[in-house]
Amino acid sequence: AEKEKLGYSICDVEHAGPYCMMAEALAMANGNPTMIGYLTGTNFGRGFPKYVREFNANFLALPAMPSSIVPNAASDAAIVVRRIDTEKDGSWLAVVNTSMEPKTSRIKCDGTEVKHAVNGKPQPMTNGQFELTLYPFQLKSFHIDR
């Protein structure tokens, strides 16, 4: 007689540190996600909550509306800038580092006042640009007043 199978086993793993947000960051850079879902085989506890919380706070600070890539908005090609325009509430920028390395980039912006979308703090600007340093696969969101 055949031995009974002992059940089902699965192992879910994630990349270490900021690299744990690679899938989410690339989805944000290349599309218009309005939800984030995970396919896991068991309970899902993130090993690097600092990066997950930072990403989620910035993701949730953006309106769930279509965005478009702003060509050449960042001085570094690995930084993708997506823009969401509204009729009444200004615009939002989603700035994503798609690189495996930390990056510093100048971001072009046509607004007169730019604020961090998560906390409302002003982002210093010079001549229609601001400088931003991002760790690998980091998302930062900004609101532009009009």
Enumerate the language-model features and the residues they cover.
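Hydrophobic beta-strand residues in large extracellular and virion-surface proteins
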Residues: 81, 95, 107, 114, ...
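Beta-strand-rich binding/interaction modules
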Residues: 102-122
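Short loop/turn positions at the edges of beta-strands in beta-sheet-rich folds
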Residues: 87, 99, 111, 136-138
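A general secondary-structure boundary signal
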Residues: 90, 116-119, 129
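Active-site-proximal substrate-binding groove within the catalytic cores of carbohydrate-active enzymes
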Residues: 1-106
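Short beta-strand element of the conserved SAM-dependent methyltransferase core
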Residues: 59, 95, 122, 140-145
